[in-house]
Amino acid sequence: MAIFRTKKENNFVIMSNYHLRDKNLSFKAKGLLSYMLSLPDDWNYSISGLICNAKENKTSIKSALNELIRYGYLNIKKLYPNQTESKKIEYIYDIYELPHPLEEDMENLELDNMP
């Protein structure tokens, strides 16, 4: 068997491969996390934004995000209108290359209730 690699001069990302070896994660969750880690650090994450760049539908994306939450790779914090400049509900995504335990004082959202 041969693996044909390209020379990495541009359009590549360096990330930990820990999540790729994590047997708790499905390939769907591994792929989504890899995609999210490949985006710029200041990217404005949203379910609708992820759907726009994927073949998967909303249910599939939410399923993968819930899996990442369950295993500590993602935390989503809901900000209420009185906490934001836009005066609208906003969501803050904290994405981890390595699993991160949920802090007791942080509320981790269940994505079934998100728009």
Describe each PLM feature range.
Residues 1-10:
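N-terminal leader segment of winged-helix/HTH proteins
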Residues 9-23:
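Short, Lys/Arg-enriched N-terminal segment that forms or immediately precedes the first helix
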Residues 19-31, 36-93:
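Winged helix-turn-helix DNA-binding recognition segment
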Residues 94-115:
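Charged low-complexity intrinsically disordered patches
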